[in-house]
């Protein structure tokens, strides 16, 4: 809504005309680029040198957000990282009483979030991260699974605690999933041997392959209807 309501003022019309795109396609492009630029801490001046109109629009958005006193999540992290890395006295004072940092879902951390964590950790006594590299599914939005896979290499004196018991699934599902992930990722994953808490009662387990996502979705829908008795 911010971009839509200020489409002309932010000079997005020039970007639209240059791309030969529709209005909402232009908004989608600039919104995605804005988030990626902040998530990866990219310099708007460098973007402008590569793509003048795109960089110009990003700068316009940044200035307008500040003047209108708005902020989004990606910019919030970016501004905090910049403050932490500038060794701001106010930041140091605000964090002086905080000794320990805990990060959950660490496998999904992106570049700016990792720099945020590092900036905070430098002012604290310890950092405790929790995550599962096998559940890293957000690479498409900038998450870097190497953050957790290589954590013990960056922090040589850290201790690693493995939670290998799975309370959610049966042994058949756990072992099959582990074998599949091992085949896909091999040495690119943290070495682990997950075990199920209980074997449970398996009615049916199988591997299915589909040529398209539509074919897969149709099969799942039909299977669900069969299981609940809908013809």
Feature map (PLM): residue ranges:
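Conserved P-loop NTPase-based nucleic-acid remodeling module centered on helicase motor cores
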Residues: 1-25, 149, 222
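Conserved helicase NTPase motor core
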Residues: 48-150, 162-169
